[in-house]
Amino acid sequence: NYTIGNDNVLTEPLSEIKTAGLMYKMGVQ
């Protein structure tokens, strides 16, 4: 459970960054 918790902590921000990056690219284009 501890490892899964760490994965969630790392994955959550990464997915938000990827989503923000996609929205930024679509906004620019």
UniProtKB/Swiss-Prot annotation:
Organism whose genome encodes this protein: Nitratidesulfovibrio vulgaris (strain ATCC 29579 / DSM 644 / CCUG 34227 / NCIMB 8303 / VKM B-1760 / Hildenborough) (Desulfovibrio vulgaris)
Keywords, A to Z?
Hydrolase, Periplasm
E.C. number(s) listed in UniProt: 3.6.1.1
Q: Which domain of life is it from?
A: Bacteria
Q: Which reaction does it catalyse?
A: diphosphate + H2O = 2 phosphate + H(+)
Any GO CC annotation of this UniProt entry:
periplasmic space
State its role. Answer: Inorganic pyrophosphatase is an essential enzyme for the activation of sulfate by sulfate reducing bacteria. This is a high activity pyrophosphatase.
Q: Where in the cell is it found?
A: Periplasm
The entry lists its GO molecular-function terms as: inorganic diphosphate phosphatase activity
Annotated disulfide bonds: none
Record-given protein name: Inorganic pyrophosphatase
